[in-house]
Amino acid sequence: MTTTYKILVLPGDHIGPEIMAEAIKVLTTIETHRPNLHFNLTTDLVGGTSIDTHGVPITQSVLDAAKASDAVLFGSIGGPEWAGVHPTPESGLLQLRQHLDAFANLRPCEFLVPSLVGASPIREHVVKGTRFIVVRENCGGAYFGEKKEEEDVASDLWVYTRPEIERLARVSAAVARIMGRSEDDNQAATVWSADKANVLASGRLWRRITSDIFAKEFPDITLQHQLADSMAMLMVRDPRRFNGVIHTDNTFGDILSDISGAITGTLGLMPSASLCGVPGEGHRSNGIYEPVHGSAPDISGKGLANPVAQILSVAMMLRYSMGLEKEATAVERAVVKVLDAKSEGGLEIRTGDLGGRATCSQVGDAVCEVLGPLLQGKKA
């Protein structure tokens, strides 16, 4: 029996189509070695290309197609040719998130490739072994609260409700369980909840409701509370301290996610996800999967783009929207084999941003070549 997954593919602008082509190669490779899986791909426009064709950064038909899909694979959007255009290309992504109610943003921070730890601006002995995921509430808080702005005074209402906090807590718990399974020990990862309960009423509500949910529904998962400002400091001094899942609101999640990106020092390797539901509950959970980096118009069309973040976004999609852990892990292991130094047993096939000379398509081809045997149960 074949299981079919509907995926909406939105390559976007500039390097978006280039890196997306390599991600689709990965899905095709999985289909070749997993005859019981089929990925039904529909490709459409978003961002600047949608503005050029339709006059808007995303059409209603694309929004409807996204809601009817099992997942959305998103490229990158924007560029200087759309400067001053309103609505902006980037607003297409915001509309997509709002339409799907993609309330949980996931940003991994880890050194998947051992020999690239040196890319971090922080000393290797401090960051080596770091592995956490920031789970950020994406649809509430100060960014979406009522705003007042006058000549000499302005305010942003920082509001959270019980349902908003509860649903994110359930996502954080699910991600902690999935992290534990991926480490082959079946022990859920620790969840670190970041707030400002010492000064913010919304922070006290956040801490109380998060504690209630974990005590009642996830008593086996370790929950720790940390003030967000001290977490930001400690994340730089000792990032391994927070290995596991960081569960936090929109504002603090925005800040902590950017710090996590600086820790790795390699935006070209960083995927992300915005989930519309709790993963791993025996049903499909829609989500938007995209690289963290931008559209890089300076290298567009030159074959220089690094496709790895887009490929790792595929791995996140397989894991969180489809529950295909073995396939997700195989994709990650293929990436490690391709990028890792020859001295570490890797192929050291890298694009220019990582000090190599390989083209975008050469990296994608190499990942697929390694992935095939891994899907058959062979070692890389």
UniProtKB/Swiss-Prot annotation:
Entry GO CC: cytosol
Gene Ontology BP, a term: L-leucine biosynthetic process
An example Gene Ontology molecular-function term: magnesium ion binding
Swiss-Prot/TrEMBL keywords: Amino-acid biosynthesis, Branched-chain amino acid biosynthesis, Cytoplasm, Leucine biosynthesis, Magnesium, Manganese, Metal-binding, NAD, Oxidoreductase
A Pfam family matched in the record: Iso_dh
Locations listed in the record: Cytoplasm
SUPFAM superfamilies, per the entry: Isocitrate/Isopropylmalate dehydrogenase-like (SSF53659)
Residue numbers marked as site, Important for catalysis: Y143, K196
EC id: 1.1.1.85
Signal peptide range in chain numbering: none
Pathway assignment: Amino-acid biosynthesis; L-leucine biosynthesis; L-leucine from 3-methyl-2-oxobutanoate: step 3/4
Ligand binding (NAD(+)): 79-90, 294-306
Record protein name field: 3-isopropylmalate dehydrogenase
Originating species: Hapsidospora chrysogena
